[in-house]
Amino acid sequence: MVELGFPAYGPAIEKRVRPLYKALCDWRAAVTLAARRRFQQLRCNANMDDDGQPMFPPLPVPDWNNPSTDWRPSPPRSGPKKDFCGDLPAPLTSGPRLTTPSSGRMSELPHTTSSPRSSPRPRGPETSPSNEHIIISPPRNPPSNTTHRNVGHVSRSPSSSSSSSSSSSPSSSSLIVLSSPSSSRSPSPSPPRPRADSSSRPRRGRGSNRGGRSGPQSKGRKASPRTRKLEDEDYLPQETANRRGGGRPRGRPPKSGRAVQRNDIQVTSSSGLADTSPYDLCGSVWWEVPLPPPGRCWFGGLGGHRQALTDSPEIVEAIHRFNTSHGPVPVYVEEMKDYAKQYDALVNSLFHKSMKVNPLNWMHHGKLSPADAALNHIYVQKFQSSYDSPGAAVTGTVNRCIPHIAGAMKERKLLWAFPHIAASIAMTRRYCKDQKTFLFRSLKKAYASMAFPDNSSETEKGISSKPSTSPSVLITTSTQTTASPHAPKIDVTAIHGRVYQSVVDLSRCLADGSLDDPEFSFAGCTRPDCCVEEFDAARPLEELADACVLACDSVVAALLCGPDGPHRVAKMLSFYDSRITPHVPDSQQWEKCRILLVSWYNELSDLRAAVYGAYGNTPTSQHLDERALAARVVSLIAETIGPLVRQDPDRAWVRMGSRDITSLLLRDWRGTNDGDPGLVKAKHLRRTAELLNDGRSSKGTYGVFAPPRRPDQLFRGPGRPRRSTSSSQSASDKSPIKSTHRHTSDPIPISTPRPERDPAGTPHENTMSGPVQPAANGHSCSSTPTPAKKGNKTSSDTISLKDPTKTRIKASAKAQTDETLPETSTAHPSAMDQSSSLERKTLYTGPAVSSKERRRSAQSSTPSDIGGVSRKRKSAPEQYKQGLQTPLPMPEPSVGQTLLDPTTTTHDILSSSLPNRSCSSSPSPSKRPYHPSCYSPTDIMTGALVGPRGRQDRAAFRQFPVGTVIGQTPPQSVLNAYCPNGAFVELVEFARIPEPWQEVLRYSPEAMADIARVANALPGKYNSNEIITSAASEAFHTATSKLRARTAWMRYQQESPDDVSIVVLYSPLPGEHLFCVPAPDTPPGGLKFDNKRGGLSFLLAAFSNRLCLPKSSAWAGRWKAAPDISPLTRMGVLFLSTEDLGYQGAVEYLQRQCMKRKKKLIIMDTVEDRYRLPNGPCIIEEATRYMKCIISPRSQCCVRWPGLRDFGTTIITSRDVVGPLTLMDLEQYYYCEIGIEDSTINLCCTGNVRYTVETRLEDVSCVPTTPLFYFAAVKHVRPDFLCGETYSNRAARKWGLCAPLRPIYVIESKMNAIVSPSFLHPTARNLCRSVILPPDPEARPVVVHIPEGTCSALAEDMVASIRSSCITWGQHEEGGPETTAQENSDIRAMKVRPPTKPPYMSPLNIGNRDTTFTD
């Protein structure tokens, strides 16, 4: 109809013509696309290419919008009549330029304003979104001399509209470019006419086809600069796109989320969502990603696939781990199927830093568990590194944690490309660490609006205001609350600004005296919707002030309910600005500012709702800025109204009207005998209302705002540090029980140096003369030379060992190896002397002496020389030669083993007389200058070693920190102990104390005395032919073992005192030790379970959120090696026992260091007064956050009431017993001292401690095991849980073997106050009977607190979420739906059925704005 001259505008014509025109365009595009696909399938030669000639001539593009006023219908077409499918018409004079297929460049033609034959459309700047020219550009090099003209029209003028869209076939070799011509000199368009149905119809004339590009260039062809500029049209800013003919008027950017129409297909402009059109935002056609065949998975390039290993047990276990995990798995395989979950977890981790490590490092080379490492090995060996793999070079992913890119391409999720690009940045070596961090931050900023489209405006605002902050932080800390989708957002920043400005205005009015004006009315910054009539003038001013006080308290209570804790809330409330602090106004001045109090009351009410709403269902650390601003508002208002309430909130608390009514509402009226409960309730409420009405009429006080539960909790919350109560301490210490049999304890930590070897490979024959002192390893060594007696003949002839026997001590699997010592042992050479005299054999442990120096010494020194002794090795005793045929080994010390074997100590430990100090000869270079055995422990403790000049600076003596002492003060007698610096150095070297902890022992002279006592443990002088007895050997072995055990805490916990943040003091049971298993003081019958005194086992059980039973892994009697507490060590926790060497000086030294750093040391003291040492450490308030609690086995209900099976997994806890409450207080202290931004800790979770015990799988196993480790030993056993740990096949397959159950904690008001289960709430008893919590190494403890008098319905609502966490079994798992738990193998198992009713939403979690009250 347009060709025949009919007008191309108007509602009637457009309504009939436009659908036909669109159908014609769609049909032509479909035919062209099908023809090109068929051409690609039927071409014989791969180099054969299309000539690029379109199948149809271009259609005229009518202007459906408002045309120009001087438009006239074009006359009928004249000239030669051409066939519809014939050759192309003559060149159009209005076409700006042409596409040259041979060269890929655009031919430019002169612009014209009319084209009567080929362009009957009127002039206008707007283009139609549906009437488009189809231009087919060849994908490869066409014949060189072929040129087609007039195949496309693209405007060159910046003012013209050059919108285009592209579509292509699935094959990458074809391309369809859609473009439309436009006039370059048309007048500016008039605004479009409003239409009634404009909301339902697509918007026209707004440049719908903006930013088109001509598609990718052919292989081997270089695009012109103009073509590249057109291709990048969509990636330019809005102003540049408008300037380049984007079709949208300047100065009017598109609205966010508006749908852009291309070929009548809606494309949402938020790229994070799935795109429903076959075109992307650039106008290009999406790739067709075919699904892999059945039984195969995506692999390699686009369309590639591999065999799926669905039957492999490793894959099955990996799928189970993936389905149960909440975060991204480190190894993802396509058999897991749910790539959307992995992508979302990766994106969330990259934005919110939930991996606690650098995301780039984690993606590139993150640590893998054994199960994940095995899975990755299978994947690499079978597919990625195989020779027959077609996609060995292209795998479709960057790292093992990222799914194949085909899933993102098929789902059209542009956001899922973020992990691929981030992993590519992490993998490259072209950038340093800082440069990679910059690139990663720029990626996060680019993808922030895509990942969080709802917060795009806040994100842009935050990025512009804080350039250095990452988008993820800005998104999570926006100034708008996200309480509920139905509630309006409360702007906390605006509230803070209004309150701050109102306080400034009030201070200014007080300063200039305007408040004294009788006609003054406050006109400062107040709430816009505030009305003073809300509180009429008849109400007293004090009531408004009290209402503000209670409102302040409600905000403080809301802050205390959050994740910050009392100390951080107190730090927030400590905001003080002296510049705005107002003067003190009187009551008359406050009467003129009543509207200010009303405004503040409303602001505080909104703040309370905003703080509670920001928490959501679970309190998190997000919205920290909102809570900080809310705390500042409370601080400002409280300081301002403080003089009005006389700095005392008691007057607000005496308004008990609301409390009286609330207490009546909470009462249970069903148990009354006065008649109908409803009538009785109404009677009491009416009586209370009458009393309140009488008080109001007499200008009494009545309730304005419901106060908190306890008035004394204003500006105070849970978790305050407690001081230890002063009590009498028993003077008698419990003497340790000495063992009569050997224990595999840890010997003294000194390794014997290897003897130097000559080039032949034999050890040097180093001998030592003079008095021999006990070395650290139990062998004898010389310290100072003594003059030889006249007539003492020694042989100078020696026979060296040609084949010395060397042995290596094999560490037992039940013991822990010492990482600081070498594994190989020192050879024990034996020399046979040809002389008849028998001299005792000595082993040289001093510095190595070269053979040349030894020969020179042997030649210059003869046996007859005075003061000189032969350095040649003497022969072994006759008893040695007759008793043993081979030389005995000298074992290396290691944790869990003894230094001296009973069969070797008799002949290996040799000693002599004490050193002669009057020796005139100087010691040789091969001898130690002084031995610590010369120092007496009594002299150290009494201070007899103090020199005439007094105490030295580097000496060891007690130095109490100055401050207020907590608990008992150590006696003054401990201050007399003194150890000189020289003796300190030798004793520390003797005990092999780690260098970072040597400075700590300078504050503990008691430790020096203990080391000197061990050094003097060997017997005294004896003749040369004597061999020390077995009793002396055993005594020395016991002393060295205990010393090694007492110094183990310095080796296997913190590397340096600077890493200590929390100190836990405890008193172990006899036989308990944290690092030496079994301990040196283990009783002959082994450890005995004590249900009255808790030791190390119960302490570690509290930190690992588990039970401690006699047959559980937590009991020290079952340990085969030291428990693994490395997670607690990484958190800065240091366990100190009262039996550890130098624990007094360690506590005092750490306090001094914390005072220097202006921080406080967190101390958790679990030592009872009867087991406390009289010379214990001095603890002061100024340097510590001190917490006193005890370890009580009776907290476990199975220990307190052994006959009740309903409470087998229940623990009653309080703040006086080590448990979740005390550990949460420690976490709050930790956050106050370290800071929540630096790190987060979880002191009460199963993953904190791992035990090495004997299981049914192996004699020595580290539990809890991983499910994959147990998968190889499947065995159907019952029950599911034995002694509080997983035992059955299905339980171990799900959580691993010996994974502990999570106990249920019930709060006890006072220690041992619950003497019978009947004292517990019935709902708590039912909960403990019917709920078993599954093992979870990362889960927080579950604490049940049901106040007295709580009705059953409310109590059931409080524990509904706990019931939903009960263990449930799926239908595919073996066994029934019941969970069986057994305390031990001697009693009957208890069966617990899963909950039948689904959990429901608690009314306690509904916010104030979600509740509607109607009359």
Swiss-Prot record:
Please list the residue ranges that the record marks as compositionally biased, kind Polar residues: 96-105, 263-272, 465-480, 814-837, 895-910
The family note in this entry says: Belongs to the herpesviridae ICP4 family.
Q: What does this protein do?
A: This IE protein is a multifunctional protein capable of migrating to the nucleus, binding to DNA, trans-activating other viral genes, and autoregulating its own synthesis. It is required for the switch from immediate-early to early mode of gene expression.
Annotated region (Disordered) at 48-272, 454-480, 691-935, 1371-1415
Instruction: Please spell out the taxonomic lineage of the organism that makes this protein.
Output: Viruses, Duplodnaviria, Heunggongvirae, Peploviricota, Herviviricetes
Q: Which GO terms describe its molecular function?
A: DNA binding
Task: Name it.
Answer: Major viral transcription factor ICP4 homolog
Places the protein is found: Host nucleus
**Regions of compositional bias (Basic residues) in chain numbering:** 245-255
Name the Gene Ontology biological process terms: DNA-templated viral transcription; positive regulation of DNA-templated transcription
One Pfam family recorded for the sequence: Herpes_ICP4_N
Low complexity: bias regions: 125-187, 724-738, 911-933
**Which key words are in the record?**
Activator, DNA-binding, Early protein, Host nucleus, Phosphoprotein, Transcription, Transcription regulation
Chief localisation class: host cell
